[in-house]
């Protein structure tokens, strides 16, 4: 899982992730947006579920973050297509709408993001 932090011409931090994990970057850019209070809530949520079978969820405007003791899932809220029939041989492209990673890797990304926000 490769990623980079950039600032655009307006000073906004943009996060980009490698293929297969793009949705994590979209989630950070759309939902987190430099909100340190939200970062604190997510880190506290990770501490709550660590070593347990419980889950912690944060539903945002565009994406939902779901975390258990081992794994983080981020998915687009519009990912579910209920009642729609697809033509035979067709399927939805959801590579940029759903991503999984380990909790420790995710927390490392958030730590690096916080550091980048404070430093640059």
Curated annotation (Swiss-Prot):
Organism superkingdom: Bacteria
InterPro entries: UPF0231 (IPR008249)
SS bond list: none
Family designation: Belongs to the UPF0231 family.
Protein name: UPF0231 protein Spro_4007
Organism encoding this protein: Serratia proteamaculans (strain 568)
């Amino acid at each position: 899982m490769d990623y980079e932090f950039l600032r655009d011409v307006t000073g906004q931090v943009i996060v980009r992730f490698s293929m297969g994990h793009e949705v994590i970057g979209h989630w950070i850019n759309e939902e987190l947006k430099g909100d340190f209070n939200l970062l604190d809530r997510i880190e506290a949520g990770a501490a709550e579920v660590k070593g347990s079978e419980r889950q912690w969820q944060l539903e945002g405007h565009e994406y939902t973050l779901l975390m258990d003791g081992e794994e983080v899932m981020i998915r687009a809220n519009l990912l579910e297509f209920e009642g729609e029939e697809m033509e035979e041989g067709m399927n939805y492209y959801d590579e940029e709408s759903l991503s999984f990673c380990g909790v420790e890797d995710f927390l490392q990304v958030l730590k690096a993001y916080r550091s980048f926000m404070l430093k640059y």
